Design a protein with these regions (language model features):
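N-terminal cap/lid segment of alpha/beta-hydrolase-fold proteins
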Residues: 28-66
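Catalytic active-site module of serine/aspartate enzymes centered on a nucleophile-bearing elbow/loop
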Residues: 301-302, 307-339
């Protein structure tokens, strides 16, 4: 039972189902966890999306002489802040600082970036109706941020970088007209979210509990009471998150990437226990023009890892552990080659 509870917590990190619970007690965790290098400068950057103002951070090289490429970094699921860390109670499960570190390294490579706090964090949480929030709202936020950056004369071209759920958001945003020269999908699923979630559960639940999950999740998505399900899975089926999950579940990333009109870079860690290499290869199969980079040692937050689930836990919580050295050069080189 104890091991199941630990697994249940890890499952929350791959879906946005948890954002309504954790965000209720969250404050914006947009502060830098570690000091950025002197080679970069950071400035506040905010943009409007509908009635909301989404706060973020602009990171640039401390010295530059011409217009820079710029990336909009889009966070993964749950109450994940601009730096890649979970807010509220889930902070103990995810404090990798991935997006801040990526931004600093991109700046050192001559690429500016903006990372932002999603709409379910901080003051904006009080301005939205969680029960009416859909994945399309998050896609609209990406488009709004992209349009502001594309109009900024400091920048030469815009790339969208999304991690985990954010990979699907940037793909959808580009397909809906976000003015991007290309998109980067980090640890992005290649199947509908419910298929990904079921696969994870199948590795961790006894068969009888998996059967209950299948029935309960189907009822949940139909708008009915989920009914009998293991207590550790109930946070995944909260009524307040139903609309979000209904709208997310209808999208298939493989179908969406096949429609992509801009270049795509897919980056995947071979030791990612949340999104497998098969997902990355499914994305490339659906869009053969996409470039795929598999980093052999990397996990979901791009730290060197084994396949041991418990050993990986520390890699999510210690921001001082270095990001794998292959990550940023793969992204930066690809961006610089884009026309």
């Amino acid at each position: 039972m104890n091991s199941f509870r630990r697994i249940g917590v890890s499952l929350l990190s791959i879906t946005s189902l948890a954002f309504s619970v954790a965000a209720q007690t969250a404050t914006v965790a947009g502060r830098i966890d570690t000091v950025p290098p002197r080679s970069v400068i950071e400035l506040p950057f905010a943009f409007q999306s509908g009635t909301l103002t989404l706060p973020g951070t602009l990171t640039m090289p401390a010295s530059y002489s011409s217009r820079l490429p710029v990336a909009l970094i889009v966070a993964g699921s749950g109450p994940t802040d601009r730096n890649g860390n979970s807010a509220g109670p889930l902070r103990a499960q995810n404090n990798s600082n991935l997006y801040a570190i990526l931004a600093w390294q991109l700046a050192d490579a001559g690429i500016a970036s903006v990372r932002y706090d999603k709409r379910a964090l901080g003051e904006n949480l009080q301005k939205i109706n969680l029960a009416q929030t859909s994945i399309d709202d998050f896609i609209a936020d990406v488009i709004a941020g992209a349009r502001k950056l594309a109009a900024d004369q400091r920048f030469s071209k815009l790339v969208l970088i999304g991690h985990s759920e954010g990979a699907e958001l940037v793909l959808q945003a580009a397909n809906r007209g976000a003015p991007a020269a290309g998109i980067v999908m980090l640890s992005g699923a290649g199947r509908p979210i419910m298929a990904v979630l079921r696969e994870q559960l199948s590795k961790q639940l006894p068969p009888e509990e998996l059967v209950k999950w299948d029935s309960a999740s189907a009822r949940y998505l139909r708008g009915e009471d989920a009914g009998d399900v293991h207590p550790g899975l109930k946070p995944l089926l909260l009524p307040v998150n139903r609309r979000f999950m209904q709208t997310w579940a209808k999208y298939d990333p493989a179908t969406e990437i096949a429609r992509a009109k801009v270049p795509v870079l897919i980056v995947q860690g071979a030791h990612d226990l949340q999104i497998g290499e098969a997902d990355a290869r499914a994305l490339q199969a659906a869009q053969p023009a996409a470039k795929l980079v598999v980093i052999p040692a990397a996990n979901h937050v791009f730290r060197a890892a084994s396949d041991d689930r418990m050993a990986q836990a520390r890699l999510y919580t210690d921001p001082t552990i270095p990001v794998v050295p292959e990550l940023t050069p793969a992204i930066a080189d690809w961006i610089k080659r884009l026309k």
